[in-house]
């Protein structure tokens, strides 16, 4: 059995807005049916008003259906309301859950509760915050300023994927 992939990308308050859109688009739309595709986007509240509209518009332009918490829907109204089951969903489709968080601790708690230990990513320019994310998140592959889509047998130099589990 291969690993389930409820993969997250966390956009930290210090994230470079210019890098957010291309990384998020790749993580969700490059191959949405893959187990390493992002299923939930977490955004720090301080950067959400600036970053979420740009990211959400780009996702919608790529055909992604968005499901957000109340705070996300207040910033970008063109999304459905997320239910608890959305946070645990491996959609394997052009559907993405979006949640606004107050801190790195809240993002890590969300990942710990709903993640599957497959692949997690943080977008940040703060080295200490990146190190803390790397140290504290429990996943087989953890990225800084990169797409979760890099978790791949070929990219890791392991050859073709035939039911390779990348879970811890």
Task: Tell me what each language-model feature is.
Residues 83-168:
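Conserved C-terminal structural/oligomerization subdomain of aldehyde/semialdehyde dehydrogenase
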Residues 1-93, 144:
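ALDH superfamily catalytic-core signature
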């Amino acid at each position: 059995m291969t690993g389930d992939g409820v993969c997250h990308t966390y956009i930290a308050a210090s994230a470079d807005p210019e890098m957010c859109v291309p990384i998020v688009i790749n993580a969700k739309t490059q191959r949405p049916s893959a187990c390493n595709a992002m299923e939930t986007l977490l955004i720090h509240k301080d950067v959400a008003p600036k970053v979420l509209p740009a990211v959400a518009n780009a996702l919608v332009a790529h055909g992604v259906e968005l499901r957000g918490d109340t705070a996300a829907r207040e910033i970008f109204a063109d999304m459905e309301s997320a239910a608890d089951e959305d946070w645990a969903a491996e959609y394997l489709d052009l559907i993405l859950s979006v949640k606004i968080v107050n801190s790195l601790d809240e993002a890590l708690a969300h990942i710990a509760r709903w993640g599957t230990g497959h692949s997690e990513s943080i977008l940040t320019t703060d080295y200490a915050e990146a190190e803390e994310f790397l140290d504290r998140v429990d996943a087989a592959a953890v990225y800084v300023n990169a797409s979760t889509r890099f978790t791949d047998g070929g990219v890791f130099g392991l050859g073709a994927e035939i039911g390779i589990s990348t879970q811890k």
